[in-house]
Protein backbone atom coordinates (compact mmCIF):
# COMPACT_ATOMS: atom_id res chain seq x y z
CA UNK A 1 0.00 0.00 0.00
CA UNK A 2 1.38 3.38 -1.05
CA UNK A 3 1.07 6.47 1.12
CA UNK A 4 -1.51 8.93 -0.21
CA UNK A 5 0.83 11.77 0.74
CA UNK A 6 3.22 10.83 -2.05
CA UNK A 7 0.81 12.17 -4.66
CA UNK A 8 -0.47 15.12 -2.61
CA UNK A 9 0.49 18.64 -3.60
CA UNK A 10 -0.97 20.65 -0.70
CA UNK A 11 -0.71 19.34 2.87
CA UNK A 12 -2.03 20.46 6.23
CA UNK A 13 0.18 19.01 8.96
CA UNK A 14 -1.07 19.04 12.55
CA UNK A 15 1.51 18.44 15.27
CA UNK A 16 0.23 17.72 18.77
CA UNK A 17 1.47 19.16 22.05
CA UNK A 18 3.30 15.99 23.08
CA UNK A 19 5.45 16.22 19.93
CA UNK A 20 6.68 19.78 20.43
CA UNK A 21 7.04 19.95 24.22
CA UNK A 22 9.13 18.30 26.92
CA UNK A 23 6.22 16.38 28.44
CA UNK A 24 4.41 19.67 28.80
CA UNK A 25 7.34 21.44 30.44
CA UNK A 26 8.05 24.04 27.80
CA UNK A 27 8.90 23.65 24.14
CA UNK A 28 11.28 21.00 22.84
CA UNK A 29 13.45 23.13 20.55
CA UNK A 30 15.23 20.14 19.05
CA UNK A 31 11.95 18.43 18.19
CA UNK A 32 10.65 21.60 16.54
CA UNK A 33 13.91 21.78 14.61
CA UNK A 34 13.31 18.28 13.29
CA UNK A 35 9.79 19.18 12.16
CA UNK A 36 11.14 22.26 10.40
CA UNK A 37 13.76 20.13 8.63
CA UNK A 38 11.18 17.60 7.47
CA UNK A 39 8.80 20.27 6.22
CA UNK A 40 11.71 21.93 4.42
CA UNK A 41 12.34 18.59 2.70
CA UNK A 42 8.68 18.39 1.66
CA UNK A 43 8.91 21.92 0.32
CA UNK A 44 11.98 20.90 -1.64
CA UNK A 45 9.93 18.09 -3.19
CA UNK A 46 7.43 20.63 -4.49
CA UNK A 47 4.76 20.32 -1.81
CA UNK A 48 2.92 23.19 -0.14
CA UNK A 49 2.63 22.83 3.64
CA UNK A 50 0.48 24.56 6.23
CA UNK A 51 1.41 23.68 9.82
CA UNK A 52 -1.14 23.55 12.63
CA UNK A 53 0.79 23.42 15.88
CA UNK A 54 -0.21 23.04 19.49
CA UNK A 55 2.13 23.92 22.33
CA UNK A 56 1.30 27.50 23.32
CA UNK A 57 -0.32 26.65 26.64
CA UNK A 58 2.43 24.18 27.55
CA UNK A 59 5.09 26.80 26.79
CA UNK A 60 3.17 29.41 28.75
CA UNK A 61 2.99 27.09 31.75
CA UNK A 62 6.78 26.71 31.63
CA UNK A 63 7.40 30.45 31.35
CA UNK A 64 5.01 31.16 34.21
CA UNK A 65 6.50 28.44 36.42
CA UNK A 66 3.35 26.29 36.54
CA UNK A 67 3.85 22.52 36.82
CA UNK A 68 0.19 21.57 36.34
CA UNK A 69 -2.25 22.63 33.63
CA UNK A 70 -4.60 25.17 35.25
CA UNK A 71 -8.35 24.63 35.39
CA UNK A 72 -9.50 28.24 35.33
CA UNK A 73 -10.26 29.63 31.88
CA UNK A 74 -8.56 32.97 32.51
CA UNK A 75 -5.35 31.21 33.57
CA UNK A 76 -5.43 28.99 30.48
CA UNK A 77 -5.88 32.07 28.34
CA UNK A 78 -2.99 33.81 30.08
CA UNK A 79 -0.75 30.79 29.55
CA UNK A 80 -1.71 30.70 25.87
CA UNK A 81 -0.90 34.39 25.46
CA UNK A 82 2.53 34.02 27.06
CA UNK A 83 3.33 30.75 25.32
CA UNK A 84 2.31 31.80 21.83
CA UNK A 85 5.19 34.28 21.80
CA UNK A 86 7.71 31.52 22.41
CA UNK A 87 6.07 29.12 19.98
CA UNK A 88 6.26 31.64 17.13
CA UNK A 89 9.86 32.55 17.96
CA UNK A 90 11.11 28.96 17.96
CA UNK A 91 9.39 28.09 14.69
CA UNK A 92 10.68 31.26 13.04
CA UNK A 93 14.28 30.57 14.04
CA UNK A 94 14.18 26.87 13.15
CA UNK A 95 12.66 27.40 9.71
CA UNK A 96 15.10 30.25 9.05
CA UNK A 97 17.90 27.67 9.25
CA UNK A 98 16.46 26.29 6.00
CA UNK A 99 15.87 29.67 4.38
CA UNK A 100 12.11 29.48 4.91
CA UNK A 101 9.94 32.31 6.19
CA UNK A 102 7.01 31.61 8.49
CA UNK A 103 3.77 33.43 9.27
CA UNK A 104 1.71 33.23 12.45
CA UNK A 105 -2.06 32.98 12.07
CA UNK A 106 -4.40 32.65 15.06
CA UNK A 107 -7.94 31.58 14.25
CA UNK A 108 -11.20 30.91 16.05
CA UNK A 109 -14.26 29.08 14.83
CA UNK A 110 -16.01 32.46 14.82
CA UNK A 111 -13.53 33.70 12.21
CA UNK A 112 -14.47 30.86 9.90
CA UNK A 113 -18.21 31.11 10.62
CA UNK A 114 -18.31 34.63 9.18
CA UNK A 115 -18.35 34.28 5.40
CA UNK A 116 -16.35 37.45 4.72
CA UNK A 117 -13.69 36.63 7.31
CA UNK A 118 -13.59 33.05 6.03
CA UNK A 119 -12.84 34.23 2.50
CA UNK A 120 -10.26 36.72 3.79
CA UNK A 121 -8.48 33.96 5.75
CA UNK A 122 -8.52 31.73 2.68
CA UNK A 123 -7.08 34.49 0.49
CA UNK A 124 -4.32 35.22 3.01
CA UNK A 125 -3.31 31.57 3.35
CA UNK A 126 -3.24 30.96 -0.39
CA UNK A 127 -1.17 34.12 -0.89
CA UNK A 128 1.33 32.99 1.75
CA UNK A 129 1.68 29.62 0.04
CA UNK A 130 2.22 31.33 -3.30
CA UNK A 131 4.96 33.44 -1.71
CA UNK A 132 6.72 30.34 -0.39
CA UNK A 133 5.89 31.05 3.27
CA UNK A 134 4.94 28.31 5.73
CA UNK A 135 1.83 29.44 7.67
CA UNK A 136 1.83 28.27 11.28
CA UNK A 137 -1.70 28.17 12.65
CA UNK A 138 -3.04 27.80 16.16
CA UNK A 139 -6.37 28.50 17.81
CA UNK A 140 -6.62 31.94 19.35
CA UNK A 141 -7.13 30.57 22.84
CA UNK A 142 -6.68 33.97 24.48
CA UNK A 143 -10.07 35.24 23.30
CA UNK A 144 -12.18 32.08 23.16
CA UNK A 145 -13.46 29.97 26.01
CA UNK A 146 -15.31 27.05 24.45
CA UNK A 147 -12.35 26.07 22.26
CA UNK A 148 -10.15 25.73 25.34
CA UNK A 149 -12.75 23.61 27.08
CA UNK A 150 -13.88 21.40 24.23
CA UNK A 151 -11.93 22.32 21.12
CA UNK A 152 -8.81 20.79 19.68
CA UNK A 153 -6.34 21.42 16.90
CA UNK A 154 -7.38 18.22 15.12
CA UNK A 155 -10.65 19.94 14.29
CA UNK A 156 -8.83 23.14 13.39
CA UNK A 157 -6.57 21.18 11.05
CA UNK A 158 -9.60 19.75 9.25
CA UNK A 159 -11.18 23.19 8.93
CA UNK A 160 -7.95 24.57 7.49
CA UNK A 161 -7.82 21.68 5.01
CA UNK A 162 -11.33 22.64 3.93
CA UNK A 163 -10.39 26.31 3.82
CA UNK A 164 -7.44 25.93 1.44
CA UNK A 165 -8.73 22.81 -0.36
CA UNK A 166 -5.81 20.75 0.84
CA UNK A 167 -5.17 17.32 -0.64
CA UNK A 168 -4.25 15.60 2.63
CA UNK A 169 -4.53 16.32 6.34
CA UNK A 170 -1.69 14.75 8.32
CA UNK A 171 -2.42 14.35 12.03
CA UNK A 172 0.74 13.51 13.95
CA UNK A 173 0.25 12.16 17.43
CA UNK A 174 1.98 10.00 20.03
CA UNK A 175 0.00 6.93 18.90
CA UNK A 176 0.82 4.68 15.89
CA UNK A 177 -2.62 5.28 14.39
CA UNK A 178 -6.17 4.00 14.82
CA UNK A 179 -6.59 0.54 16.33
CA UNK A 180 -9.61 -1.76 16.20
CA UNK A 181 -9.76 -1.43 20.00
CA UNK A 182 -7.78 0.22 22.78
CA UNK A 183 -4.43 -1.63 22.63
CA UNK A 184 -3.80 -0.81 26.29
CA UNK A 185 -6.83 -2.89 27.24
CA UNK A 186 -7.19 -5.36 24.37
CA UNK A 187 -4.05 -7.34 23.39
CA UNK A 188 -5.84 -8.45 20.21
CA UNK A 189 -6.23 -4.91 18.90
CA UNK A 190 -4.76 -4.35 15.44
CA UNK A 191 -3.80 -1.22 13.53
CA UNK A 192 -6.28 -0.03 10.92
CA UNK A 193 -4.08 0.59 7.88
CA UNK A 194 -6.76 2.09 5.64
CA UNK A 195 -10.47 2.89 5.84
CA UNK A 196 -13.04 5.28 4.47
CA UNK A 197 -13.19 8.63 6.25
CA UNK A 198 -16.55 8.94 7.97
CA UNK A 199 -17.22 5.20 8.18
CA UNK A 200 -19.52 4.72 11.23
CA UNK A 201 -17.48 1.85 12.67
CA UNK A 202 -14.44 4.09 13.08
CA UNK A 203 -16.12 6.15 15.79
CA UNK A 204 -16.89 2.95 17.71
CA UNK A 205 -13.22 1.95 17.55
CA UNK A 206 -12.00 5.35 18.75
CA UNK A 207 -12.69 7.12 22.02
CA UNK A 208 -11.03 8.34 25.18
CA UNK A 209 -9.53 11.68 26.06
CA UNK A 210 -6.17 13.11 25.14
CA UNK A 211 -3.19 13.59 27.38
CA UNK A 212 -3.05 16.03 30.30
CA UNK A 213 -0.97 18.37 28.15
CA UNK A 214 -2.94 18.10 24.92
CA UNK A 215 -6.67 18.02 24.33
CA UNK A 216 -7.47 15.66 21.48
CA UNK A 217 -8.13 11.93 21.76
CA UNK A 218 -8.45 9.49 18.86
CA UNK A 219 -12.16 10.22 18.45
CA UNK A 220 -11.44 13.86 17.65
CA UNK A 221 -9.03 12.70 14.95
CA UNK A 222 -11.65 10.43 13.38
CA UNK A 223 -14.19 13.25 13.38
CA UNK A 224 -11.57 15.61 11.94
CA UNK A 225 -10.98 13.19 9.07
CA UNK A 226 -14.72 13.11 8.41
CA UNK A 227 -14.77 16.92 8.22
CA UNK A 228 -11.72 17.05 5.98
CA UNK A 229 -13.39 14.63 3.58
CA UNK A 230 -16.12 17.20 2.91
CA UNK A 231 -13.66 19.13 0.74
CA UNK A 232 -12.12 15.98 -0.72
CA UNK A 233 -9.09 15.84 1.59
CA UNK A 234 -7.72 12.48 2.70
CA UNK A 235 -6.31 12.06 6.22
CA UNK A 236 -3.30 10.26 7.62
CA UNK A 237 -3.03 9.61 11.37
CA UNK A 238 0.50 8.59 12.26
CA UNK A 239 2.99 8.61 15.09
CA UNK A 240 5.20 11.64 15.28
CA UNK A 241 7.66 9.45 17.19
CA UNK A 242 8.53 7.65 13.95
CA UNK A 243 11.87 8.82 12.60
CA UNK A 244 11.47 11.21 9.64
CA UNK A 245 7.80 10.30 9.43
CA UNK A 246 6.84 13.13 7.06
CA UNK A 247 9.71 12.47 4.68
CA UNK A 248 8.96 8.75 4.61
CA UNK A 249 5.25 9.34 4.03
CA UNK A 250 6.07 11.71 1.18
CA UNK A 251 8.33 9.03 -0.32
CA UNK A 252 5.36 6.66 -0.45
CA UNK A 253 5.89 4.59 2.70
CA UNK A 254 2.61 3.63 4.36
CA UNK A 255 2.75 4.59 8.04
CA UNK A 256 -0.15 4.75 10.46
CA UNK A 257 -3.79 4.93 9.35
CA UNK A 258 -4.98 6.31 6.03
CA UNK A 259 -8.58 7.56 5.92
CA UNK A 260 -9.73 8.05 2.35
CA UNK A 261 -12.29 10.66 1.29
CA UNK A 262 -14.60 8.52 -0.82
CA UNK A 263 -17.62 10.84 -0.91
CA UNK A 264 -18.08 13.54 -3.53
CA UNK A 265 -16.57 16.91 -2.70
CA UNK A 266 -19.20 19.33 -1.41
CA UNK A 267 -19.85 22.59 -3.18
CA UNK A 268 -17.85 25.35 -1.48
CA UNK A 269 -20.82 27.12 0.11
CA UNK A 270 -22.40 23.90 1.41
CA UNK A 271 -19.06 22.73 2.79
CA UNK A 272 -18.75 26.06 4.60
CA UNK A 273 -22.25 25.62 6.05
CA UNK A 274 -21.55 22.04 7.13
CA UNK A 275 -18.26 22.64 8.88
CA UNK A 276 -17.80 26.27 9.80
CA UNK A 277 -21.18 27.49 11.03
CA UNK A 278 -22.15 26.80 14.63
CA UNK A 279 -25.32 24.78 15.17
CA UNK A 280 -27.73 26.75 17.34
CA UNK A 281 -30.51 24.21 17.81
CA UNK A 282 -32.09 20.98 16.62
CA UNK A 283 -35.32 19.83 15.04
CA UNK A 284 -36.45 16.22 15.24
CA UNK A 285 -37.92 15.12 11.91
CA UNK A 286 -40.12 12.16 11.01
CA UNK A 287 -39.16 9.21 8.81
CA UNK A 288 -40.85 10.70 5.77
CA UNK A 289 -38.83 13.89 6.07
CA UNK A 290 -35.62 11.91 6.54
CA UNK A 291 -36.32 10.04 3.32
CA UNK A 292 -37.12 13.20 1.38
CA UNK A 293 -33.91 14.88 2.54
CA UNK A 294 -31.55 11.95 2.06
CA UNK A 295 -33.00 10.29 -1.03
CA UNK A 296 -34.98 13.00 -2.73
CA UNK A 297 -32.86 16.09 -2.19
CA UNK A 298 -35.92 18.02 -1.05
CA UNK A 299 -36.37 21.00 1.26
CA UNK A 300 -37.45 20.50 4.86
CA UNK A 301 -41.07 21.53 5.38
CA UNK A 302 -42.64 22.32 8.77
CA UNK A 303 -44.98 19.33 8.46
CA UNK A 304 -41.99 16.99 8.80
CA UNK A 305 -40.88 18.44 12.15
CA UNK A 306 -42.03 16.61 15.28
CA UNK A 307 -40.03 18.47 17.96
CA UNK A 308 -37.88 21.57 18.44
CA UNK A 309 -34.81 21.65 20.71
CA UNK A 310 -32.88 24.75 21.73
CA UNK A 311 -33.34 28.42 20.98
CA UNK A 312 -32.44 29.77 17.57
CA UNK A 313 -33.22 32.75 15.36
CA UNK A 314 -34.12 33.00 11.70
CA UNK A 315 -30.98 32.73 9.57
CA UNK A 316 -29.06 30.54 12.03
CA UNK A 317 -27.92 26.98 11.42
CA UNK A 318 -29.90 24.13 12.94
CA UNK A 319 -29.37 20.38 12.85
CA UNK A 320 -32.02 17.95 11.64
CA UNK A 321 -32.03 14.70 13.62
CA UNK A 322 -34.11 11.54 13.34
CA UNK A 323 -36.05 9.92 16.17
CA UNK A 324 -32.87 8.20 17.44
CA UNK A 325 -30.97 11.48 17.70
CA UNK A 326 -28.76 10.80 14.66
CA UNK A 327 -27.96 13.96 12.72
CA UNK A 328 -29.17 13.70 9.15
CA UNK A 329 -28.63 17.22 7.83
CA UNK A 330 -28.11 20.80 8.85
CA UNK A 331 -29.03 24.08 7.28
CA UNK A 332 -30.07 27.70 7.59
CA UNK A 333 -33.55 28.03 9.04
CA UNK A 334 -36.21 30.40 7.73
CA UNK A 335 -38.00 30.51 11.08
CA UNK A 336 -37.01 30.97 14.73
CA UNK A 337 -37.42 28.23 17.31
CA UNK A 338 -40.52 29.94 18.71
CA UNK A 339 -42.08 30.15 15.25
CA UNK A 340 -41.09 26.57 14.41
CA UNK A 341 -42.83 25.25 17.52
CA UNK A 342 -46.05 26.88 16.32
CA UNK A 343 -45.89 25.57 12.75
CA UNK A 344 -44.40 22.10 13.32
CA UNK A 345 -46.58 19.30 11.89
CA UNK A 346 -48.48 21.92 9.88
CA UNK A 347 -48.77 22.01 6.07
CA UNK A 348 -47.03 25.00 4.52
CA UNK A 349 -50.40 26.34 3.42
CA UNK A 350 -51.31 26.91 7.09
CA UNK A 351 -48.19 28.89 8.07
CA UNK A 352 -49.79 32.27 7.41
CA UNK A 353 -52.93 31.28 9.31
CA UNK A 354 -50.89 30.22 12.36
CA UNK A 355 -48.30 33.02 12.41
CA UNK A 356 -50.17 35.80 10.62
CA UNK A 357 -47.47 35.85 7.93
CA UNK A 358 -45.40 33.45 5.85
CA UNK A 359 -41.72 34.16 5.31
CA UNK A 360 -41.07 31.04 3.24
CA UNK A 361 -42.99 27.79 2.64
CA UNK A 362 -39.95 25.76 3.77
CA UNK A 363 -38.33 25.60 7.17
CA UNK A 364 -35.00 24.98 5.39
CA UNK A 365 -34.70 25.39 1.62
CA UNK A 366 -32.70 22.67 -0.10
CA UNK A 367 -30.20 25.27 -1.35
CA UNK A 368 -29.41 26.07 2.30
CA UNK A 369 -29.34 22.46 3.50
CA UNK A 370 -26.49 19.95 3.53
CA UNK A 371 -26.47 16.26 4.41
CA UNK A 372 -23.97 15.20 7.07
Curated annotation (Swiss-Prot):
<dbReference type="GO" id="GO:0055129">
    <property type="term" value="P:L-proline biosynthetic process"/>
</dbReference>
<keyword id="KW-0808">Transferase</keyword>
<dbReference type="Pfam" id="PF00696">
    <property type="entry name" value="AA_kinase"/>
</dbReference>
<keyword id="KW-0547">Nucleotide-binding</keyword>
<dbReference type="Pfam" id="PF01472">
    <property type="entry name" value="PUA"/>
</dbReference>
<dbReference type="GO" id="GO:0005524">
    <property type="term" value="F:ATP binding"/>
</dbReference>
<feature type="binding site">
    <location>
        <position position="54"/>
    </location>
    <ligand>
        <name>substrate</name>
    </ligand>
</feature>
<keyword id="KW-0028">Amino-acid biosynthesis</keyword>
<feature type="binding site">
    <location>
        <position position="153"/>
    </location>
    <ligand>
        <name>substrate</name>
    </ligand>
</feature>
<comment type="pathway">
    <text>Amino-acid biosynthesis; L-proline biosynthesis; L-glutamate 5-semialdehyde from L-glutamate: step 1/2.</text>
</comment>
<dbReference type="GO" id="GO:0003723">
    <property type="term" value="F:RNA binding"/>
</dbReference>
<dbReference type="InterPro" id="IPR019797">
    <property type="entry name" value="Glutamate_5-kinase_CS"/>
</dbReference>
<dbReference type="GO" id="GO:0004349">
    <property type="term" value="F:glutamate 5-kinase activity"/>
</dbReference>
<dbReference type="InterPro" id="IPR036974">
    <property type="entry name" value="PUA_sf"/>
</dbReference>
<dbReference type="InterPro" id="IPR036393">
    <property type="entry name" value="AceGlu_kinase-like_sf"/>
</dbReference>
<feature type="binding site">
    <location>
        <position position="14"/>
    </location>
    <ligand>
        <name>ATP</name>
    </ligand>
</feature>
<keyword id="KW-0418">Kinase</keyword>
<dbReference type="InterPro" id="IPR002478">
    <property type="entry name" value="PUA"/>
</dbReference>
<dbReference type="GO" id="GO:0005829">
    <property type="term" value="C:cytosol"/>
</dbReference>
<dbReference type="InterPro" id="IPR001048">
    <property type="entry name" value="Asp/Glu/Uridylate_kinase"/>
</dbReference>
<feature type="binding site">
    <location>
        <begin position="173"/>
        <end position="174"/>
    </location>
    <ligand>
        <name>ATP</name>
    </ligand>
</feature>
<feature type="binding site">
    <location>
        <position position="141"/>
    </location>
    <ligand>
        <name>substrate</name>
    </ligand>
</feature>
<comment type="function">
    <text>Catalyzes the transfer of a phosphate group to glutamate to form L-glutamate 5-phosphate.</text>
</comment>
<dbReference type="InterPro" id="IPR005715">
    <property type="entry name" value="Glu_5kinase/COase_Synthase"/>
</dbReference>
<dbReference type="InterPro" id="IPR011529">
    <property type="entry name" value="Glu_5kinase"/>
</dbReference>
<dbReference type="InterPro" id="IPR001057">
    <property type="entry name" value="Glu/AcGlu_kinase"/>
</dbReference>
<keyword id="KW-0067">ATP-binding</keyword>
<comment type="similarity">
    <text>Belongs to the glutamate 5-kinase family.</text>
</comment>
<dbReference type="InterPro" id="IPR015947">
    <property type="entry name" value="PUA-like_sf"/>
</dbReference>
<dbReference type="InterPro" id="IPR041739">
    <property type="entry name" value="G5K_ProB"/>
</dbReference>
<protein>
    <recommendedName>
        <fullName>Glutamate 5-kinase</fullName>
        <ecNumber>2.7.2.11</ecNumber>
    </recommendedName>
</protein>
<feature type="domain" description="PUA">
    <location>
        <begin position="280"/>
        <end position="358"/>
    </location>
</feature>
<keyword id="KW-0641">Proline biosynthesis</keyword>
<keyword id="KW-0963">Cytoplasm</keyword>
Amino acid sequence: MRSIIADSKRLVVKVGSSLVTNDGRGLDHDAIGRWAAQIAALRGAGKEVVLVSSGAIAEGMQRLGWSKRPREIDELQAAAAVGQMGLAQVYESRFAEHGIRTAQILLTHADLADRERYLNARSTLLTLLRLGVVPIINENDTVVTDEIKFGDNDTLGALVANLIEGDTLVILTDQPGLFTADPRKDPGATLVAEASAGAPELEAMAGGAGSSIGRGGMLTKILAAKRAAHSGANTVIASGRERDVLVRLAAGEAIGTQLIARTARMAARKQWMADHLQVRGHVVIDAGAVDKLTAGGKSLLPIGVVAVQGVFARGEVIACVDDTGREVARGITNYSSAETKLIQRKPSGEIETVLGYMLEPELIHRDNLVLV
